[in-house]
């Protein structure tokens, strides 16, 4: 496929720019995806208003097409593909690792320390464009039951949380506390339940998020943070606290409560 497309870049200074790019051609082990949905992450908001604060492996390469939560349909195949083909609906995992190091081979591409590691939307072109070039190894098949928007929302937030919960081995033996019920915190509760947690507890400042966690059945108990919150949790767990705690609040008080 040849031609031009418009893509969004994030130069900071409360600005998003649209620039013209060539539609990329997939090479070995690559596919061209027509973007059907590409959601916005908190890191995108930060980059728009305060520029990307990451350095080194997390640094933003100026002029890179933004969007690390893309989902779409494969419209063109490169060579030597093993699992995917034209017409497949796919989610793009937001980190493209080397595929060879220990972390990559364990499925933890986000922890890849190779110089080849690149995040879509930060160091390589992402999904805020009509088409995105992706490595086949970075793709996850999107089930028919899920929409493209579902897939885009899963790409980063759920993927990051899933790795964390897998590493701490959440199971039916565990009561799980999640502090901070934004999108990532809510995803944490949902995945913890799916992994068998016998009790899920959420702590959140905003009332609407507390209500959402309860109405969706994600948390067995939800509390607002105050001087009594720790005692409430101890009372629920027979005085010994929870087996696993995840802080999604980015707040010192939240981290302290989780610990």
Regions found by a protein language model. Give the residues of each.
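Short, well-ordered coil/turn residues at beta-beta hairpins
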Residues: 93, 246-248
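Mid-domain Rossmann-like dinucleotide-binding core that forms the NAD(H)/NADP(H) cofactor-binding site
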Residues: 144-227, 231
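Conserved amphipathic alpha-helix within the SDR
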Residues: 229-239
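NAD(P)H dinucleotide-binding glycine-rich loop of Rossmann-like/cofactor-binding domains
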Residues: 57-61, 68, 98-179
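Rossmann-fold NAD(P) dinucleotide-binding segment
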Residues: 252-259
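N-terminal glycine-rich cofactor-binding segment
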Residues: 7-25, 42-76, 91-92, 111-125
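Glycine-rich beta-strand-centered segment in the early N-terminal region that forms part
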Residues: 22-38, 53-102, 138, 143-145
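Short SAM/SAH-binding signature in class I
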Residues: 240-246
